[in-house]
């Protein structure tokens, strides 16, 4: 793939120079950073939005400079974190205590995402987030939360059409949980330890299937339990339609 073979004793990193490999600088918690300065409802404040864009622009400038200095390709990764959303928040709770709308939530928001507790329309969420990925060449994801829309697929198509030339990667989160005991299809109810069928209260991972967007990927938190902070974040999500 690199068009060359190393000689005995040569360092393997020679193959990765000239930007042939990527080192990513990830970030989470942009929502919380702006909340510390502008309050919890800053998403509609143009000054606050520009403040967050300046943060990611600064990260991008640093990675570009590192690429010139070291010869590798450095990129900014708008991270859909899994365990760090819990770990970083716990560390800050130890240092700063429970700060309203920041550490008090027990999780940090992924990358540049809109506060999951709020319910903008899918179009408003896309419009808010679309300005960040240009500074996140290492990867990113947008997503919107929906109720069951089996009888209204045109609603999803309207969002997809709107997103087509505005964002590069859009996840669609619709409830597809299933209980094999009572036959329920829909969305399971979050509990302190996981999720349960709202109809028969079943929570046995052997007899139910629960699908949630854990970070960037879709996971089954009943079969593979997630960290506390991510569970709280998923349980806090509201629908955008």
Which residue ranges define each predicted feature?
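Long, C-terminal-biased catalytic regions of enzyme "large/alpha" subunits
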Residues: 1-241
């Amino acid at each position: 793939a690199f068009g060359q073979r190393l000689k005995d004793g040569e360092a393997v990193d020679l193959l990765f120079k000239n930007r042939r490999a990527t080192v990513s600088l990830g970030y989470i918690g942009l929502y919380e950073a702006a909340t510390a300065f502008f309050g919890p409802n800053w998403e509609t404040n143009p000054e606050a939005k520009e403040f967050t864009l300046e943060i990611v622009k600064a990260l991008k400038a640093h990675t570009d400079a590192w690429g010139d200095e070291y010869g590798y390709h450095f990129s900014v990764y708008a991270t859909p974190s899994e365990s760090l959303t819990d770990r970083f928040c716990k560390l800050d709770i130890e240092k700063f205590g429970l700060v309203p709308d920041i550490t008090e939530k027990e999780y940090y928001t992924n990358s540049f995402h809109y506060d999951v507790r709020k319910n903008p329309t899918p179009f408003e969420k896309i419009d808010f987030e679309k300005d960040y990925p240009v500074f996140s060449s290492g990867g990113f994801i947008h997503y919107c939360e929906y109720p069951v829309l089996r009888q209204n697929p045109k609603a999803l198509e309207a969002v997809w059409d709107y997103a087509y030339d505005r964002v590069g990667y859009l996840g669609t989160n619709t409830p597809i949980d299933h209980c094999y005991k009572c036959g329920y299809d829909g969305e399971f109810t979050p509990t302190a330890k996981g999720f349960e069928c709202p109809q028969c209260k079943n929570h046995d991972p052997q007899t139910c299937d629960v699908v949630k967007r854990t970070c960037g990927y879709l996971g089954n938190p009943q079969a593979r339990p997630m960290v506390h902070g991510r569970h709280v974040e998923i349980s806090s999500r509201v629908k955008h339609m």
